[in-house]
UniProtKB/Swiss-Prot annotation:
Protein's name according to its UniProt entry: Mitotic-spindle organizing protein 1
Quaternary organization: Part of the gamma-tubulin complex.
Keyword Cytoplasm: yes
Cell compartment(s), UniProt: Cytoplasm, Cytoskeleton, Microtubule organizing center, Centrosome; Cytoplasm, Cytoskeleton, Spindle
Source organism per UniProt: Xenopus tropicalis (Western clawed frog)
Name of the coding gene: mzt1
Disulphide bridges, residue numbers: none
GO biological process, one term: gamma-tubulin complex localization
UniProt similarity note: Belongs to the MOZART1 family.
Main function: Required for gamma-tubulin complex recruitment to the centrosome.
Any one GO CC term of the record: cytoplasm
Keyword annotations: Cytoplasm, Cytoskeleton
Keyword Cytoplasm: yes
Length: 72
């Protein structure tokens, strides 16, 4: 059981480091989103393709927000 505890601690520490790097790079990713991205990459998703999808979703979201604010 101590081994599982140590493993969870290592995972938590790794995610904390990745979150700090993410913040330094100003990615705008929160812990949950970053965790999802890491899991997708671990499952073989191309990180560059994932990055492109995230950027496109952000652009679409901003466009939608802008159109909603002008329609109001």
């Amino acid at each position: 059981m101590a081994n599982a505890s140590g493993s969870m601690s290592a995972v938590r520490e790794t995610m904390d480091v990745l979150l700090e790097i993410s913040r330094l790079l100003n990615t705008g990713l929160d812990m949950e989103t970053l965790s999802i991205c890491v899991r997708l990459c671990e499952q073989g998703i191309n990180p560059e393709a994932l990055s492109s999808v995230i950027k496109e979703l952000r652009r679409a979201s901003e466009t939608l927000k802008a159109s909603e604010s002008t329609a109001s």
